[in-house]
């Protein structure tokens, strides 16, 4: 067991009766009490527990009664740096859930045994980022940040050493360190998993295979781990490596109750059912390696859930699915190997599997390891001995077989763990170019149990090495402190443990060397090893031989004496694998198993050099120390507050032992050897200035004043540095004793004066009370006599009035009864007469009404039938028309395409009709000419035939005459022959003429037939042309109707309208009237003649010559419009200023867009150009004047659009209600498509001087306009956020100065009369910081007002800024204990009054509810400065004083409060206890546990909010800028008078 060997320096301390002291107690370590009597070297103490104790004067220590109620966050600030002071400070802070405490730059972390997520969230990491050590409350993040900043700034590697016993929280602390370093040096994911992600996720994997439940801890690391996190030049994590030390292999086979084996075995047994069946597993109690303990499950831990989490972590660190399957197959094989039991075989000293169950597990293990079943059995039951002559197989007895089985299991598990570490390192990767790293060492703390074996020896050897490194570091820090303060001092004695290290590691005579020597001899036993130790170290002061044991030995470590049992030292030190096991697993069919047992190199197998666990561990430790010596160390000492592993339990004795083991008390001893008490000058003067009033009244420097105080007290050996007073041990107690005497004397004088004053006051009160009592008695008697007289007079008066009342009452009763009877009789007669007349008149009226009713009923029935028929018919027509209108509204694009097609078809048909007309005329003309030709040719042919017949007749007659006058016969015959020939020729010619005539007749008949066919075809074409014209007319009418239904006309009509607008105002008005008539016609209010005029007008436009409409006018107008847009863009780039608090730029843009009808077109580039212009203008984000100017213009333009534009099809719809919850405007883009508030005054838009005041118009916006509105909304948000963030950046440094000002600008307490001047200067210096904030706020307000930013936006900006101030000040207050003081509360309260005054001056129009946003800091400061806190109840604090603060925030500020002005205390312990109860009830709610505030950077308004907040204004009289004023294209911008 550990024996205390640490004592503090025995320094004589002056004690007096009434002094508060600490004395030792065997049960609770230290108890405080008050000295009652001093007898030489003994004192009688009245303990706070009620008992009286006698103790030696040298064994008691002074108690600081003025120590803060909440302790100090750095124990070097303790007035008395000794064991009880350290223990009490840790206990106080632990009770307040302050688990971290500094001792210089050493962080002590006490395990709370409960989750505290609020102190590890991202917001807390942000707070500690870049904060100097000690500025904020102690935290593990602060140590990590200091290491990281030192590495970045100095370029030197750093290390963080986390130590502590099992269960102290080392593993969790290491996780938080790595998480914070990943937060500082992390980068965005680029290719798969990041280095920091893999490093963090390696923890669950290594915990699963290297952690186990022990007696002291449910998740104890059974190996040492050193994580090297490498960083590149930019400070980003670039690589990492994990090094492990001394895995506890024996735990695989041997565990004790109530411990557990490694977590992975239980995780695998809780795996999904298919995996359990696959590996043939069951409940953990069925396996020998697990059922040696009755603990199978951990409270609050799900092994099934952790198994899946481990598999996910394996995926992240790069272990493939196949490798994971092989890993858990090997783990399952180890469990089955442990269930193989052996019994004696047939041969002597042989063994075989015991039963079928053992054979089953043997077979399963062989299957899982994929090795030969027989070979596995032989490897467990036999040994092979190789001699020069032969190979001998030797059987093992059952006990040796069990040892062989366990050896195989330990070897396989050890190789598996080493493979995991190598795999993780390969997966993470190391950066060869990295020059700096931060190493995080998570290693076992000092251990001492009832049974301490080889593992405890190695662990304590490691801690001895680290303690030497720690002592050197602390000694170095002390030297640096003294050198920094420039004091004269002799070098303190360095506490060294080199003798213990020589005892363990010295060659050749150290314990490790002797153990290796014993392991090399086969016949060595633990008895021979122990005897060797006894002989070698019998004179060593650190080595102890027990009296009652022959094999045990003890070593006096720095933390105490530890007794080791040497029985298993030799077996555990041997580092070799049985050849049969190596051969068996090297021949496995599983590549993974073969990889765990690679073949040994030939030289290694032939080498006879012995290798041991101890030597290898010593070499690893040497390498670790070399690495640590090359780094700048930072220390975290983890402490376990109790062995029950429960929260809110603080075991003093246990913690004192851990502080010794962790070297914390050793560091305090080093400090006590020099100057343990160090007080800054102002604190020293605050506390001890009353011992020498002359030093305060003189005009002295603080340093000189401290010197005079110490000289007056007659102290020797102290030192005064540059900023602090250094006191030797015991001097602080002497000063406190002198101070107590002065205070006691002053208290007696005060008590005497107060008693005199109270007695005098009591006498005066008593005399005054006596006189008052006498006066009251006399007055009472007089009043009683007066009452009697008054009662008698009253009785007489009552009797008189009573008699009169009764008489008058009886008379009135009789008079009323008479009147009632008379009235009744007269009324009865009148009613009877009235009833008769009424009945007569009613009969007449009934008859008349009945006749009228019958006539009206018949008429109404007939009328209702007619109206019903008409209504249904009109309803059917209206529904039909409504469906068409809806279809047209939804299919505007389709209508436009149909319209274009119809226009093309009309043009085509028109062209075809004209072509047909021309072709018909040509055909008629050709037919006429052809008929004429045929007639003329026919007449000619007829004439030729007549001439030929006449000639033939003449020739016949001539022939007859010739025959008659012929000569002789021959002559006549020749003549006859010649005539005959001529006749034949003539006949032939006649026949040919007849044929020709017949042909001509046929051609004439064909021409006539064709002419008749052409006439018929022409008639058909005429009919078709008429039908076509009729269809064209119908199409034109349909086209006209579609034009009336569509909200946008085609581009040709738009150009014609613009031309008409620019040329003649009357035409523009007519076009405007036309659009109004169109909307009126849709509502059913258009007259018939107006509709006909509109149709004619539309018809005339659509039937113009295309060359006239589309070519020249459109081209010229587009060019002119482009020029106008360019001119507009050039003008708005300039700072146009404001006119009548209205931004000119926004108004000009709006009027131009409205005039050009840009909101109603499907395509336009003007919106993009305007947006680009705004974007270029705000590129300089630090120019607040420019940002404010454009915020004013964009918000005004957005307001105009919001009130003017509406989505297509939204006419007549009710305005959409505003969003119920919206974080940002841009996040609610759909809101831009909702209907705007009804109506925009045309007088405001068009510049009309009069009339039209009751006319409202909204524009149905197309997609580009709606998109422009969305972009404008985004720019309003962006510019607003830029202005707000610029103001935040400007005031952030000032806020830091404000909260730190009380520490840096406190006035000196010395220098006599100049103290008031110093106080005034300090107050002015503090207020200067707040005035700097006020000045920034005022400048921003003036900038926003000069640019006419809407007051609504100004209020939102300052509301968020004040919320930011509230968050920053409040968080700083809760994270800095020195800020939670009474004086600091007064300072901050004075600064807040400056902000309140600013809000008052800014008026509610611009400041709004800004002052209310400071409610958290105001109430917190109110708590700091309120008096008599101990008398306040929790209800008063939480409901009256600080109703806004949560219970966590109240608890934090109550525990951190300290009164540096009056020395009063915080709230009562009962209130603190009640707060802790309430916090425990809410412990499951992570959000409620957070005491810090979050800064809200969202956009706190919507478009509707902005629209409703801004009043309507006229833009008709806005003067255009000179650049566009003279341009005729912008004449519409000029007022009407011009």
From Swiss-Prot:
Dilute domain location: 1168-1481
Domain IQ residues, every copy: 743-772, 766-795, 791-820, 814-843, 839-868, 862-891
Region of interest (Disordered), residue spans: 1017-1041, 1098-1121
Chain ranges of the Myosin motor domain: 70-740
Key words, A-Z: Actin-binding, ATP-binding, Calmodulin-binding, Coiled coil, Motor protein, Myosin, Nucleotide-binding, Repeat
Sequence ranges of Basic and acidic residues compositional bias: 1017-1032
Residue stretches in coiled coil: 892-1064
Source superkingdom: Eukaryota
Domain Myosin N-terminal SH3-like: 16-65
Chain positions recorded as ATP binding sites: 164-171, 217-225
Gene Ontology cellular component annotations, sorted alphabetically: myosin complex
UniProt-listed GO biological process terms: actin filament organization; actin filament-based movement; organelle localization; pollen tube growth
An example Gene Ontology molecular-function term: microfilament motor activity
Keyword Transmembrane on entry: no
Disulfide bonds: none
Region described as Actin-binding: spans on this chain: 503-537, 539-562, 597-621, 621-643
UniProt free text on domains: IQ domain mediates interaction with calmodulin.
Family: Belongs to the TRAFAC class myosin-kinesin ATPase superfamily. Myosin family. Plant myosin class XI subfamily.
Subunit details: Homodimer.
Protein name (Swiss-Prot/TrEMBL): Myosin-9
Organism: Arabidopsis thaliana (Mouse-ear cress)
Lineage of source species: Eukaryota, Viridiplantae, Streptophyta, Embryophyta, Tracheophyta
Gene encoding the protein: XI-C
